[in-house]
Amino acid sequence: MIRAENISSGEEQECGAILNWLLPATLLPVAAYAQEATVKEVHDAPAVRGSIIANMLQEHDNPFTLYPYDTNYLIYTYTSDLNKEAIRTYNWSENARKDEVKFQLSLAFPLWRGILGDNSVLGASYTQKSWWQLSNSKESAPFRETNYEPQLFLGFATDYRFAGWTLRDVEMGYNHDSNGRSDPTSRSWNRLYTRLMAENGNWLVEVKPWYVIGSTDDNPDITKYMGYYQLKIGYHLGEAVLSAKGQYNWNTGYGGAELGLSYPVTKHVRLYTQVYSGYGESLIDYNFNQTRVGVGVMLNDIF
């Protein structure tokens, strides 16, 4: 089957070193050939639907405006199986429940617009995903797992066209992902990644390959289950958005996939249904196979 701790000063230094490497080695060619997307002053929807970078290039009255990076949602879920073995050191593990509240918060901030031309931005993002045992009042409703995912990246808004598709986003950066736990439940990895997003009519396709760097002692076989890339597909059907994303290791046959459906109920809130099946829904479950179904609300979909 398609199977926090706070960031240390050492990790911050590593992030800076990686950025210094990324700029001259891989990003300047993109700056040289990408078509310019002029920074615009706007106060409404993004100029390019689904483009994270085009959205971040827009200027607002408030200089501290935060932008959505990934989706932001809250859903009530039920899983086919709970990974109690991974959390056996928690004193409440035997009483852990299969129903949980799952939510994701994902925001980005432009650090330097126009760093390599008007179509470029140096940005930072933070994504947090949590699994909350809200109904487990017997154990004081603990958080079973939380994943913290900061990124530092350089992005370009482009307008390249090929066979009906338009390449909208080119992004390269550094990603740290951890659950902020100490041993034996600590899970973390660091990656260099590239994200490419293209659109064609009502379709959106995004591919995000990565290269693992640094130590993975907490989870040495994580790529066996999480692979080396993520693929995301979206389709706009009227006001509804259908989405699918997943990762897969073709050598091992392990991976995981997430399906989503959202529909607006107000101007700012969407009804959201999500199904995840396979390995790697969270870091603590990277090598655990399950199917989880959830229903709730969403603030922003992929486009």
Predicted regions and their residues:
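Cleavable N-terminal export/targeting peptides
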Residues: M1-L57, F303
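Outer-membrane beta-barrel "beta-signal"
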Residues: N289-F303
